Regions:
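A residue-level marker of the well-folded mature domains of exported/periplasmic proteins
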Residues: 29, 34-403
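Sec-dependent N-terminal signal peptides of Gram-positive bacterial secreted proteins and lipoproteins
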Residues: 2-25
């Protein structure tokens, strides 16, 4: 409406000008063209001004700031995004109260993100990776009025600074995924046992001791990875004793090429089932590609249900239910309740699980998994946190229990 009104006024003004000038000397063609051009420019300027938005638009203000090492295209990061959103919904927290920072670098990148989030009013800052541990600790010391949460790769992390100061605003979180890794191992063991029974395992997939070869790709050789690897291996052995697990450490969390290369090496060496502790899904994709080429290869995924991308190869996935922790955190902060500074969550808390079994899982696996999970939940079965690195990257069937 504003545009129409302005245009009408301008047209009326032109008509009046033309009528008033009828007794004047006739203008030259050049002068007339000049006037028409200026008139056109004035019309455009008037209309453009109506559509210009306010220059000083209010900046987003938040209550929770989230620092992510990836984005929603990566399984690990997406699991956190989904968990935080679900938790926000559980406590009726508006989406606009959350400010996201994606693909943030460690150290300086993290510190810069923290400063920006505090400037925007965030009172809780969550960092979803252990790469931010030192930077977050430093910022927590400088900003005691802000609560900091960092996801760690070890069950025990200190909230004390080098000079002995206790940081009451620093919260360490660890998911006991090794418990779910054990259950995933049971799933893999059921598959291997069935393949052996039906004599479908090729000769190259046995070592010289007649153990079936399994493969594992790990991002880093840290305590958490070792605990997951060992628990997974022992889960397999609970069903199928004669197995050997070959482990490839790639020293990278977000490197799909490195993941794919390691997975390819394991497949070529004859590994029947692959598993991983990485942020991406390249291992599962490599297993699916090999399966489509007729190879005897299956896989256990990580961080999310991967059946959609690997319908033939996927057996299950090890999953952290992040909404459990984030709901507890948000609820405690909203209602002034105590929150543990070192939080560990496993099956008992509903914080870890395995995803829905894939079509390739062996018959009877569901019942076996259900019984195993119940025993872990009620404490009848304790899954040990073995954090010792496997010797030479290999867990042999005779030495698995001691690893």
């Amino acid at each position: 409406m504003k545009k129409k009104f302005l245009s009408v006024l301008l047209i009326v003004a032109v008509l009046i000008g033309m009528a008033g000038g009828s007794g004047r000397q006739t203008e030259s063609g050049e002068q007339k063209a000049d006037k028409e051009q200026k008139q056109q420019e004035n019309e455009q300027t008037a209309e453009t001004k109506v559509e210009i938005p306010p220059e000083n638009e209010e900046e987003q203000k938040g209550w929770i700031g989230v620092i992510l090492n990836g984005d929603e295209t990566e399984a690990y990061t997406l699991a956190h995004i989904d968990g935080i959103r679900a938790a926000a919904e559980n406590v009726s927290l508006p989406e606009q109260d959350i400010i996201w920072k994606e693909r943030v670098g460690a150290n300086d990148g993290c510190k810069s993100a923290v400063k920006d989030l505090i400037r925007q009013g965030c009172e809780i800052i969550i960092a979803n990776s252990a790469i931010y541990e030192e930077a977050i600790k430093s910022e927590a010391e400088k900003n005691p009025e802000v609560d900091f949460v960092v996801i760690n790769d070890s069950k025990t992390q200190s909230t004390v600074t080098e000079d002995g100061t206790e940081l009451t605003n620093l919260y360490n979180v660890h998911m006991d995924t090794y418990e779910a890794s054990y259950v995933a191992g049971v799933t893999a063991g059921m598959k291997v046992a069935k393949l052996k029974e039906k004599k479908k395992i090729p000769a190259k997939s046995f070592d010289e001791k007649k153990n079936v070869k399994l493969g594992y790709v790990a991002a880093e050789a840290n305590d958490d990875a070792h605990a997951d690897i060992n628990a997974y291996y022992l889960g397999v052995k609970a069903v199928c004793k004669k197995v050997v697990l070959q482990v490839e450490y790639i020293d990278a969390w977000n490197n799909s090429d490195a993941e794919a290369t390691a997975a390819g090496d394991l497949i070529r060496s004859g590994c029947v089932v692959l598993a991983s502790n990485t942020d991406l899904d390249a291992v599962m994709q490599m297993a699916e590609n090999a399966k489509e080429r007729g190879k005897c290869v299956y896989a256990v995924g990580r961080n999310s249900d991967m059946r959609q991308m690997a319908g033939k190869a996927a057996l299950t996935s090890v999953v952290s239910v992040w909404s459990v922790y984030y709901t507890e955190l948000f609820d405690a902060k909203l209602n002034g309740r105590y929150m543990e500074q070192n939080w560990n969550g496993g099956y008992a808390q509903g914080a870890v699980t395995i995803s829905t079994l894939g079509k390739s899982a062996s018959s009877g696996t569901g019942d076996r998994v259900k019984k195993t999970e119940e025993k872990i939940k009620n404490g009848k079965k304790q899954i040990a946190y073995f954090s010792t690195r496997a010797l030479d990257g290999i867990l042999e069937s005779e030495k698995g229990q001691e690893q």
